[in-house]
């Protein structure tokens, strides 16, 4: 792993005054960053599909307030919980413990987030749409941390990251989605930061390290081979290759991208196929049938997969990939009986869990196919994840204690960063694609979700 520090020198002809030293220190800590307006980025559709803030209707104002409250809560938690330290600063914690009124800092799998469910994407898109300096500062710190500490830069697991744990590198589960280049592309292209460029380049051949990780190894009579999932493994490779190709125009990575898209398009059910494939190092994905015991379908769409896919489709002008996404976004929301009918009985029992995680790809499908029923379904699931009849508190913090100085200590008792990152990201993207399908009033929102079972409420 890595931790990079910067040293900036200022040479003066005389002894530096205190004011000059403070000015210099402030400039080093907060160097100027050239940015365009949010409207300019949005007009060029920089970094995929994301919305500008609008508060023309009651429901839009509610969603924008929730997005603002969500970010402000995490910004304040960084200070309140002292999420600092050489190896920790920039990351946030994974799961809150309402009994102890603290984050589960001491429980493996519930401590540091390590990019799980892409809080990086949520924060960077939130910055692009708001232009807020404080958002940039938090997102920058996360990119600097995650691009250094959370993955292996060389060695047998080069380009592979470590899943969340009490220590960032402590989990035995090593995955490419933790380290994929897409986490940091926005920061790199906004600043040209050379160290981030190096870190992204360190991931370009992460697929070649998979043979060294036991979890991805299989054996048959011919020897060992690698098996990967369509997401988040293949999607992470695509992110790495896309970034390397757009920076270098190296055709090697473009061919690996095109090979995989071709392979998936020839599978019987497109992106729903598998979801695991035998993988060859030229990017070839070998379909080996359907796995009805797989629990991994939601991992295709909650680890940045849709964002990688649709940026890639736009970059390449790839109609095949656009069609694959449009079909899969609708397929995810079908009932098990409908899936069984569509696949001639081959896909039925496999869980397509967390339907609200699929809001972005569902919104993409509804937008491109003009499917109003699907659009309504997407909003139902996304809204009901945060609110339900009788509970519209959302991300409003509550006071759990006051200290000797009468300072209030705040919490959101049910919060998980998995939920925060995915709800923030999916709301930002769905507002762009399906704003017209959102009810204007909160009464309309209540009517939309009143028949929802409620089992996805605050679930992540």
Predicted regions and their residues:
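Catalytic cores of extracellular degradative/oxidative enzymes
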Residues: 1-457
């Amino acid at each position: 792993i890595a931790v990079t520090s910067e040293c900036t020198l200022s040479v003066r002809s005389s002894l530096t005054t205190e004011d000059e030293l403070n000015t210099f220190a402030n400039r080093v800590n907060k160097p100027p960053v050239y940015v365009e307006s949010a409207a300019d980025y949005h007009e060029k559709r920089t970094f995929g599909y994301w919305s500008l803030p609008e508060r023309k209707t009651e429901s839009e104002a509610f969603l924008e307030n929730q997005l603002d409250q969500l970010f402000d809560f995490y910004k304040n938690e960084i200070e309140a919980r002292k999420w600092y330290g050489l190896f920790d600063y920039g990351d946030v914690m994974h799961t809150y413990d309402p009994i102890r009124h603290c984050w589960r800092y001491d429980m493996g799998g519930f401590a540091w987030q390590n990019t799980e469910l892409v809080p990086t994407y949520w924060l960077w898109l939130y910055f692009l749409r708001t232009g807020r300096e404080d958002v940039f500062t938090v997102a920058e710190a996360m990119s600097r941390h995650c691009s250094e500490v959370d993955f292996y830069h060389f060695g047998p697991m080069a380009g592979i990251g470590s899943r969340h744990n009490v220590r960032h590198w402590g989990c035995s589960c090593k995955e490419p989605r933790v380290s994929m280049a897409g986490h940091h592309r926005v920061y790199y292209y906004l600043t040209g930061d050379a160290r981030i460029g190096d870190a992204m380049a360190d991931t370009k051949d992460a697929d070649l390290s998979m043979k060294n990780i036991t979890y991805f190894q299989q054996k048959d009579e011919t020897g060992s081979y690698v098996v990967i999932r369509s997401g988040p493994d293949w999607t992470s490779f695509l992110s790495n290759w896309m970034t390397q190709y757009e920076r270098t125009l190296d055709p090697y990575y473009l061919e690996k991208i095109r090979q995989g898209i071709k392979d998936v398009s020839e599978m019987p059910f497109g992106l729903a196929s598998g979801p695991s494939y035998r993988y060859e190092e030229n990017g070839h994905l070998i379909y080996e049938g359907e796995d009805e015991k797989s629990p991994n379908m939601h991992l295709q769409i909650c680890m940045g997969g849709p964002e990688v896919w649709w940026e890639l489709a736009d970059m390449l002008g790839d109609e095949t990939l656009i069609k694959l996404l449009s079909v899969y976004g609708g397929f995810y929301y079908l009932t098990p009986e409908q899936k069984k009918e569509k696949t001639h009985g081959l896909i039925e029992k496999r869980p397509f869990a967390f339907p609200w995680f699929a809001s972005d790809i569902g919104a993409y499908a509804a937008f491109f196919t003009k499917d109003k029923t699907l659009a309504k379904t997407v909003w139902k699931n996304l809204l009901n994840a945060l609110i339900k009849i009788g509970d519209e508190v959302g991300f409003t913090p509550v006071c759990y204690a006051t200290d000797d100085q009468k300072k209030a200590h705040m919490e959101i008792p049910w919060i998980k960063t998995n939920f925060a990152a995915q709800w923030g990201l999916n709301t930002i993207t769905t507002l762009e694609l399906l704003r017209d399908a959102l009810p204007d009033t909160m009464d309309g929102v209540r009517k939309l979700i009143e028949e929802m079972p409620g089992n996805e409420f605050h679930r992540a």
